[in-house]
Each structure stands twice: as C-alpha cells, then as structure tokens.
Amino acid sequence: MEITFQKVEHRYQYKTPFERRALYDVDVSFPSGGYYAIIGHTGSGKSTMIQHLNGLLQPTNGTVQIGEHFISAGKKEKKLKPLRKKVGVVFQFPEHQLFEETVEKDICFGPTNFGVSEEAAKQKAREAIELVGLEPELLARSPFELSGGQMRRVAIAGVLAMEPEVLVLDEPTAGLDPKGQNELMEMFYKLHKEKGLTVILVTHNMEDAAKYAEQIVVMHKGTVFLQGSAEEVFSHADELEKIGVDLPMSLKYKRAIEEKFGISIPKATLSLEDLTHEVVQVLRKGGHESCSS
C-alpha cells in the first residue's frame, strides 16, 4: 500500500490567534513494502507527519494518499476505520496505553473493535504474542505484572493483532536499555521481511536509521530537507549537523581517525565494520586519498 504526501501543509489551531505551522510543502512517497526512516531535530515535524498516516490529523492544505484512501484539506475521509486497521501506529511508550485486566484482553481489544469475533480475536492474540517473542502463558496475566520491556511488547502485539499492512513506529525503543533496543529493532526488521510489512520508523537513533532503512527522509522546520539512501543522506554530514541532526557513531569515528592520522577515507561508512574495512583499504594504498564524504 503506497503512501504519498502531495504538497501537504498542517497548521495547529488553524485560523486562531495561536495558529502554528508544523508542516509545509511536504512532497514524499513511501512505496509499498519498503522500510523507511524519518529523522530530524526535535520539532522538525516528524510526529505531525506520521499522524496524517491514519487520519489522526488532516492536512490544512494538500493531500495524503494511503492506498485507495485520500485525506485532503477540507474533505472528510469517510472510511477512517478500515484505514486505521491497515495502518498500525506504535507511539512512544505504548505500554502506557495498556488498560485491560489481562494481556489477552488488551491484545484482543483492537481486533474486536474492528468486528472480529471473540474466538478469532483470541487466536490473533496468541499469534501476535508469539510474533513479539513472548510466551503464550503470559496471556492470562495482568499486563501490569510484567516488566517494562514485556509491557511494550504486549502493546506492540495489540497493534500487530489487527494485521496492518503498514507499521508506523514513533521512537519505539525510547527508554529501553541497549539490549532491549536491539532486540526490538531486530524484531521489527524480521516482521518487515517475513510479513512484507511497510515500516516507517521515526527515530533519533542514527545507527538504527542507517542499519535498517532503505530510504531516509530528513525533516527540517516542517518540510523535507533531504531524502535518499543511508549512504546518500549521510554523505551530507556537514549539512545535517548544521540543522541539528546527529551522525552515526561510525561517521564520528571516521572524522576522528582522519584528523588524528592525516588520512582521507572517501566512503561514508555507516557501521564500525565498514569503517574498519575502509581504513585498512586506505592504509594499503598509502593513506592519502581525496575525501568526498
């Protein structure tokens, strides 16, 4: 299910003295089945942008097309319920949205709300909890007896139980330790590969953006500043730093090595493994090449 933003603008508290423009002239497409990252400094418009994907927000100007659904300025999309089934959104700290007395009831809430029978919803709950790496035995427990990491996985299972075609992740690893972050990101990538899900990741973690995303969209002051593959985007390191976007650690180490040893590493290395390989290659050639990154 392809997603397209066409000249999208969004203003909060439109036509009031408190009006504030959050998005403008946003033109971007997310073809079906891809893995995408949206990055940018705090306040750049990332979260506002993704709230247009299932109709939580409506454009002030322009159109957002999600498959056969069109959300346009001044026009109400009548079929938001099926759209919200197709586009699953995992917001920051989703475990705060848990409320039922058992894990099973919490995961079943979404499917039953969309008309699925109780028996079918329970089956979806069993499948979803295994997808997120938890044991089915947890279904009978209160979600509030679980660890923070388990609660987050339960909340994500609730989204997956609705069998979305698009999975939108807004800082999904916020507050987790490094091990938990890595496990969750690997889980999302596995779901993307095995289920063919379109994944749109909003993140401040540049390592995750570089590692998983096929395309990266850089937002700045409410509009698209840059778009391309990880290699293309992070080759603009100076411009990114000027607008407050962090760089992957491998690029920071690359700069430090260049300055310390007086060598030039042409490639925009996106992992420590790549950096090690490139340093070896440069040293073998004598250590002096023009730096184009």
From Swiss-Prot:
Keyword Cell membrane among UniProt keywords: yes
Binding site for ATP: 40-47
Keyword Membrane tagged: yes
Keywords linked to the UniProt accession: ATP-binding, Cell membrane, Membrane, Nucleotide-binding, Translocase, Transport
SUPFAM superfamilies: P-loop containing nucleoside triphosphate hydrolases (SSF52540)
Gene3D superfamilies documented for this protein: P-loop containing nucleotide triphosphate hydrolases
Listed SMART domains: AAA (SM00382)
Localization per Swiss-Prot or TrEMBL: Cell membrane
A molecular-function term among this protein's GO annotations: ATP binding
Protein's job: ATP-binding (A) component of a common energy-coupling factor (ECF) ABC-transporter complex. Unlike classic ABC transporters this ECF transporter provides the energy necessary to transport a number of different substrates.
Family: Belongs to the ABC transporter superfamily. Energy-coupling factor EcfA family.
Assembly and interaction partners: Forms a stable energy-coupling factor (ECF) transporter complex composed of 2 membrane-embedded substrate-binding proteins (S component), 2 ATP-binding proteins (A component) and 2 transmembrane proteins (T component).
Protein name listed in UniProt: Energy-coupling factor transporter ATP-binding protein EcfA2
Gene: ecfA2
